[in-house]
Amino acid sequence: YGIETDIHCTKDSKIVCFHDFNLKAKFKINKFLKNIKYQDLLKISKDKKKPIPLLNDLIKLSKNKRFLMLEIKPLFTKENLKALLKEVKNLKNYSLTSFNEKNIINLHKIKKKLNLGLLIPSTFTFNRVIEKSKKKHVKFLVLEKKFLREKKLHKIKKKIYFYAIRDKKLFNQFNNKNLIFENL
């Protein structure tokens, strides 16, 4: 199995692995990651004994032995995208994904040969999924699990992953698919 993580930039442009845009749910502090410096974030996470690693820490830990799927949560500036590419330059097996297609477009403009995936929410129609799959900057799709039962998946000529599988029964039923799962 590989590792999927969400990434954000702090106020001082450090790339961190964290799911939420805000610290409220995990730390009961109403601050957005983009508005806080990494040293302040580090202090909060250490005080609460809930570490927030830098992307670079995850990369070192993975030692190029695990596939890393890195989801860019907010819209990154072009400077932050370039910094991200610098951090992943020595990785052999990774992909960059986002719900925000502008991140994928901008990454593709910077470097054409990246493994870029577009995340597709459950609100999309299947026709819209097909349309997005034809974009040259999209190398693969990450579809919400509702699309697992879609009969016309074969029409998509790119690799497909499915998120977020939290149910063992569903995992076992579709384990021949590319599933992104959590807490199983």
Indicate where each model-derived feature is located:
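Sequence-level detector for tyrosine residue identity
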Residues: Y1, Y38, Y94, Y161-Y163
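A residue-level structural signature of the nucleotidyltransferase/glycosyltransferase Rossmann-like core
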Residues: G2, I15, L33, S95-L96, ...
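Glycine-rich, proline-tolerant flexible connector loops at the mouths of alpha/beta enzymes
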Residues: E4-L23
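C-terminal active-site rim and adjoining tail of enzyme catalytic domains
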Residues: H8, K43-I52, G117-L184
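Short acidic, gly/pro-rich beta-turn/loop elements at beta-sheet edges
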Residues: I15, N80, N106, R128, ...
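Short amphipathic alpha-helical segments
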Residues: V16, H108-K109, L153-H154
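Metal-dependent phosphodiesterase/phospholipase catalytic core, i.e.
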Residues: H19-T123, K136-K139, L143-K146
